[in-house]
């Protein structure tokens, strides 16, 4: 398979073995990374490999592995707390759409008052783009395309509702 790069508001880095570049890519945005994943045991070796790539590039990593399918406000809050405690200046979403959605919600919630739910689709006030932590997305599945959009879908279990964070 040929390698290629494509840029349209999101840069796409694609090709066999390109995960080795993750550390240098993340380092462009910060030195303290919160890696956001599901807790899946079979994926632990991949998570460790990516952590090693990041630390090899001089990036300090905290691993939030509390993502569930259809991430909830509670997921976002727990991840945002970990990001704040770690002093994260960049978020890495690693996995499928749920990890990506959680990473983007965490990037907002860690830097804004209230919860990610407070910043839903065209709800005021909108998140301040200059405060939102940068998100690097590494997709391990095909599906929603969450890795190339700014949209994050989260679930509010108390209201039994699911909506998009998109502003």
Set out the residue ranges of the language-model regions.
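Fold-independent oxyanion-binding glycine-rich loops
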Residues: 16-17, 37-39, 67, 94-96, ...
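ATP/NTP phosphate-donor binding region
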Residues: 1-90
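Hydrophobic/aromatic beta-strand patches that form the interior of the parallel beta-sheet core
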Residues: 62, 92, 134-138
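Glycine/serine-rich anion-binding loops at beta->alpha junctions
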Residues: 88-106, 140-146
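Short Gly/Thr/Asp-enriched flexible loops that form oxyanion-binding sites at enzyme active sites
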Residues: 50, 78-80, 99-112, 148-151
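Low-complexity, flexible helical/coil segments
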Residues: 50, 69-75, 95-101, 126-132
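N-terminal loops that bind phosphate or other acidic moieties
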Residues: 85, 106, 123
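A glycine/threonine-rich phosphate-anchoring loop and its flanking beta-alpha core
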Residues: 20, 111-167
